[in-house]
């Protein structure tokens, strides 16, 4: 399930660190988080869709690795991002 381009652009605009920023860890993690949320909702309805579940696990792993990278590079940006996204209760 692809993310709607308008929604993706809105997320990019919201989390970008500068004009034209699409590759910063903050933007990538925010986009992944939205895709993870959408797939989680899909799996609540379609419990036996194991192909999607496997894709979801890949996205969760990718987000976890990016969060680890951001934590090692700049702990303040990491803390601000997890606060904004509502991760890590």
Swiss-Prot record:
Listed PROSITE patterns: RIBOSOMAL_S15 (PS00362)
GO molecular function terms attached to this record: rRNA binding; structural constituent of ribosome
InterPro entries per UniProt: Ribosomal_uS15 (IPR000589), Ribosomal_uS15_bac-type (IPR005290), uS15_NS1_RNA-bd_sf (IPR009068)
Gene Ontology biological-process entries: translation
Keyword tags: Ribonucleoprotein, Ribosomal protein, RNA-binding, rRNA-binding
Gene3D superfamilies tied to this protein: 6.10.250.3130, S15/NS1, RNA-binding (1.10.287.10)
SMART domains attached to this UniProt entry: Ribosomal_S15
GO cellular component, one term: cytosolic small ribosomal subunit
Family: Belongs to the universal ribosomal protein uS15 family.
Entry function: One of the primary rRNA binding proteins, it binds directly to 16S rRNA where it helps nucleate assembly of the platform of the 30S subunit by binding and bridging several RNA helices of the 16S rRNA. Forms an intersubunit bridge (bridge B4) with the 23S rRNA of the 50S subunit in the ribosome.
Alphabetized PANTHER family for the sequence: RIBOSOMAL PROTEIN S15, BACTERIAL AND ORGANELLAR (PTHR23321), SMALL RIBOSOMAL SUBUNIT PROTEIN US15M (PTHR23321:SF26)
Subunit structure: Part of the 30S ribosomal subunit. Forms a bridge to the 50S subunit in the 70S ribosome, contacting the 23S rRNA.
Stated name of the protein: Small ribosomal subunit protein uS15
Gene of this entry: rpsO
